[in-house]
């Protein structure tokens, strides 16, 4: 674990590792393995992958036992490894790094917590098993097709559950993938109005992209400031606060944020790009 974290999480108090960072580690450090991660998963798909012998990792909701600040909503996210299922009991067997091994989790409860993260899932498998994985994923094998399916599902869920902040957040996240930034910003507006969890921007950064690319710099700055109140060492929030400062004409403040993001995460490609961008002006 520490061998991996030294590369993708060099600061031990970093509260988040993105799933694409995990995927990059597999691709660059474990050449005998392949990985896939998709969004918009389902209970049936998880069962199919497990039945074929593939453990599946998902990102889902976790609640802390104690508060870290006044009026802490205790909501957080973490990765959960699924290693089996029991249709009779309607449960998955899960490996939970916070609680312990081989814990049952009901299908319904898992799906409710999984929705908050766009039902993302990841699997790692030997190269020779790629045809089987491709067959199981079927229409979701193509990342673009998968995102379109997730976008359609989020549209349906936000229409059927208009008070569900995660349905709107997922809609925005999938719109960002297709660079519909104005539409995504509107979806995130709805999610904000309904009230997303206090730590949401520790794990997901679609609102930053949506507000930046739709020209809503004041909203971008406000969100980045809020995210840093909750997670002061978030390199992603520092990066986007830096871009907000840049848009507002505060180049020195932008440079300081980009440098701090890089200091927190050495090699952070987006921070390196931002610093190079400022240097080229």
Predicted regions, residues:
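Register position in tetratricopeptide repeats
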Residues: 177, 213, 247, 277-281
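Noncatalytic regulatory segments and standalone regulatory/sensor domains
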Residues: 69, 73-74, 83-176, 183
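Active-site-adjacent substructure of cysteine-protease-like catalytic cores
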Residues: 41-95
């Amino acid at each position: 674990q520490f061998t991996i974290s030294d590369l993708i999480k060099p600061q031990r108090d970093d509260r988040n590792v993105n799933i694409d960072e995990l995927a990059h580690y597999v691709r660059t450090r474990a050449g005998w393995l392949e990985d896939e991660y998709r969004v918009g998963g389902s209970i049936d798909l998880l069962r199919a992958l497990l039945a074929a012998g593939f453990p599946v990792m998902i990102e889902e909701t976790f609640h802390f036992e104690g508060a870290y600040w006044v009026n802490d909503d205790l909501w957080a996210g973490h990765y959960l490894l699924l290693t089996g299922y029991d249709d009779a009991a309607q449960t998955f067997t899960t490996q939970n790094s916070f609680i312990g091994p081989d814990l049952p989790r009901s299908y319904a409860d898992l799906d409710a917590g999984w929705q908050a993260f766009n039902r993302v899932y990841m699997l790692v498998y030997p190269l020779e098993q790629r045809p089987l994985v491709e067959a199981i994923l079927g229409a979701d094998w193509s990342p673009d097709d998968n995102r379109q399916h997730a976008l359609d599902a989020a549209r349906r869920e936000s229409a059927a559950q208009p008070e569900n902040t995660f349905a709107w957040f997922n809609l925005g996240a999938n719109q960002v993938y297709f660079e519909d930034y104005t539409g995504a910003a509107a979806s995130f507006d709805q999610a904000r109005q309904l009230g997303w969890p206090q730590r949401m921007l520790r794990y997901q950064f679609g609102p930053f992209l949506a507000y930046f690319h739709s020209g809503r710099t004041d909203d971008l700055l406000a969100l980045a400031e809020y995210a840093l109140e909750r997670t002061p060492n978030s390199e992603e929030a520092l990066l986007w606060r830096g871009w907000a400062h840049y848009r507002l004409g505060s180049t020195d403040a932008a440079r300081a944020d980009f440098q701090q993001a890089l200091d927190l995460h050495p090699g952070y490609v987006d921070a390196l790009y931002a610093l190079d961008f400022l240097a080229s002006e």
